Amino acid sequence: MDATEIGICIGDNLMRKLSSEAEKIMIERFGKDTVIALATVEQEMPYVRNVNAYYEDGSFYIITYALSNKIKQIEENPNVAIAGDWFTAHGKGNNLGYFGKEENRIIAEKLKIVFAEWIDNGHNDFDDENTIILCVKLTDGLLLSHGTRVYSDDSESATITLQTDENILSFVGEDS
């Protein structure tokens, strides 16, 4: 059974690469209902749209529709970019399938809580099996914050703190 069969999206060991400070900032900013820009590509043309997203364990989770252009584009090219709240990143888009399937139960329950303010406003049809969870596994990115520049790469000593006078936290995942 792979990760998609159990309704999770592994962030390419990115979480082991982020410093505890960077992870804390990611959770504070994105571990709730947040709007991010999601960019996909179709025939060498970028397409950007705002989506509601929730961050957990190196991945963003988004409720969307399987027949939407964004999912069609991700099926052709899973490489995506995101941006929001002083954060930019690349990742891999992965359709986890129907929101209501048993394998997605844990993340779906979290999304119901996180998106409680709008989830039942009629925009989503949870009886429709095309209502799906999109997972964006982060591969690399840049997080801006207060006073620290942290790099994370593939080396054994993955996190190095430098130049505390700057407001930059940076990380690189394994697929970069």
Language-model-detected regions and their locations in the chain:
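Hydrophobic residues embedded in beta-strands of well-ordered beta-sheets
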Residues: 46, 60-61, 141
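Short, basic, glycine/proline-bearing loop/turn elements
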Residues: 8-12, 48, 52-59
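An N-terminal domain-start capping segment
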Residues: 35-54, 134, 167-176
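Residue-level marker for the onset of beta-strands and adjacent loop->beta junctions
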Residues: 49, 78, 130-132
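A short mixed-secondary-structure module that forms the rim of ligand-binding clefts
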Residues: 54-88
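Charged, gly/pro-rich active-site loop segments
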Residues: 2-17, 88-176
